[in-house]
């Protein structure tokens, strides 16, 4: 599916079997966490610590993924060191996908682990066609890279 900057692979964040399938498809370590994308902050209700639900940075829908303390009810496969990586999307395709699912998705770049991301939909289709359940059509947003990642508590930039 298209995002603001690159094509992604993802699934229902609360479906551990589907998350495991994404890990297998990418050849990715299960110890690496995913970015969680949602259409609005309400979809983060059981994912992030309630103290951070109304942070203006999180609500801005900028192309920034925030590392936020995890909610105590957040599934363990979504957390790393009691934190989660979350982004409220402004991309219409992903926004509608999350709304239709009525919840967040995990997201990772459409490539094999430790390879460069691919922004050619034909190459992505050739690479993943028989491995994924569905390829969502749509244009990329106006960004030309992966999202910036920042820690919401320390404001440290982890990826530019």
Segments predicted by a language model, with ranges:
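Active-site-adjacent structural elements in enzyme catalytic cores
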Residues: 2-160
């Amino acid at each position: 599916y298209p995002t603001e900057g690159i094509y992604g692979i993802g699934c229902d964040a609360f479906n551990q079997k589907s998350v495991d399938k994404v890990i297998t498809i990418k050849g990715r370590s299960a110890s690496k966490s995913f970015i969680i994308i949602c259409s609005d902050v309400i979809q983060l209700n059981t994912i992030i610590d309630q103290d951070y639900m109304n942070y203006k940075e999180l609500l801005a829908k900028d192309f920034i993924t925030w590392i936020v303390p995890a909610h105590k009810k957040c599934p363990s496969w979504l957390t790393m060191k009691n934190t989660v990586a979350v982004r409220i999307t402004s991309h219409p395709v992903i926004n509608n996908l999350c709304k239709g699912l009525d919840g967040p998705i995990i997201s990772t770049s459409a490539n094999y682990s430790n390879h460069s991301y691919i922004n050619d939909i034909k190459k992505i289709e050739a690479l993943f066609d028989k491995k994924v359940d569905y390829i969502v059509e749509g244009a990329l947003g106006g960004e030309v890279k992966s999202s910036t990642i920042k820690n919401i508590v320390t404001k440290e930039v982890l990826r530019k």
